[in-house]
Amino acid sequence: MANVTLVTGFLLMGFSNIQKLRILYGVLFLLIYLAALMSNLLIITLITLDVKLQTPMYFFLKNLSFLDVFLVSVPIPKFIVNNLTHNNSISILGCAFQLLLMTSFSAGEIFILTAMSYDRYVAICCPLNYEVIMNTGVCVLMASVSWAIGGLFGTAYTAGTFSMPFCGSSVIPQFFCDVPSLLRISCSETLMVIYAGIGVGACLSISCFICIVISYIYIFSTVLKIPTTKGQSKAFSTCFPHLTVFTVFIITAYFVYLKPPSNSPSVIDRLLSVIYTVMPPVFNPVTYSLRNNDMKCALIRLLQKTYGQEAYFI
């Protein structure tokens, strides 16, 4: 170890070293980032301002939108600036901060999605007691615990990762700091701390997954007992968006954080990282709003308040 030079900063490789392509990637990701930002902020605004959306389901959806905004805002602006300024460097502190926020918000999303599945379970399987069970205090507590556990996990995960020394190459073959890339340049002889963190993350994800699966088993068995097709369709329409969002998020998160690191990162690794960081914030608003009449009506009401009756013709 005496002749090993310790790393004092990192270089984020990104997707290309060609100047024109870097600018193209920067502009493309800027447009995607703005789309994710505006769509999620619109959902937050509608749920906050519209009285008819003051329900547990939309309360959790607003929390999910906040997490999406924060999650996409951690790596993408830095990537855009790097491409437009041709500067790939990031300090160790900046890398640690990026990893802390991304793991915290990602873990928070998993727990919020789990809380949303429980909300759907109570709404469909226990409709008469829904308002009693899912009261304001319970909803706030579930959301607070989700954010808190996410923050604690992110802190522990990041502390474990940066307790290791880094030496040799300072190049991170990604557009943001992720654990698999950092493991490749670690010169620590033991990785028990970080693998313990990965194990805890896997256990938390699997626990949430099991809770959601159990919730949907009860939900589907209840929905199939509804005598009318219209009633079944309405019940399923509130569940499928959540199930789709969770499936996409948990699969991409697994491939980014929990898969064993390879010696040579592939294009697929970077593509999965893009899907994981960009797809949920862009995909979630579309999934939850495209066939959601409540959200459409709330948007019309907001436009009417802002522009008058002409909003009917927009």
From Swiss-Prot:
Glycans are attached at N3, N83. GO terms for molecular function: G protein-coupled receptor activity; odorant binding; olfactory receptor activity. GO terms for cellular component: plasma membrane. It holds the Pfam family 7tm_4. It is found in: Cell membrane. Keywords: Cell membrane, Disulfide bond, G-protein coupled receptor, Glycoprotein, Membrane, Olfaction, Receptor, Sensory transduction, Transducer, Transmembrane, Transmembrane helix. This is Olfactory receptor 14A2.
